[in-house]
Amino acid sequence: MKKIITGMALLLVTTLSAFSQTKNITVSGRVVEDTKEPAIQATVQLLLLPDSVQASGTATTAQGYFTLPKVIAGKYVLKVSYIGFKSQYIPLHLYATTTAKNVGTLTLETDA
């Protein structure tokens, strides 16, 4: 009985330790048109690899900024789409040691 309780306690401590190492990462950036004007309400999606399931998503602000809070570590593709412009796909590898990832300014190209 003592071994069972000790084993269960060890399992609980290990599980809690694993969960405490999962950090929330904030992904942010700015989206502009090729004229350098902000891409207002552009769609920003964070797709989890390998199956491209949407993990998070938002629309850009009036200034073209976006923030995706509470993202967990992993491999992703950041997809940015906006009517009249070509979609952009940016690979992201977010590590557990990271708390924030700024992808910078993304310039969208006009869809001819």
Where in this protein do the model-derived segments appear?
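Glycine-centered loop-to-beta-strand initiation motif
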Residues: G29, T60-L68, L106
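Structured interaction patches on ligand/partner-binding surfaces of diverse proteins
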Residues: F85-V103
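Bacterial Sec-dependent N-terminal signal peptides
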Residues: M1-R30, Y76
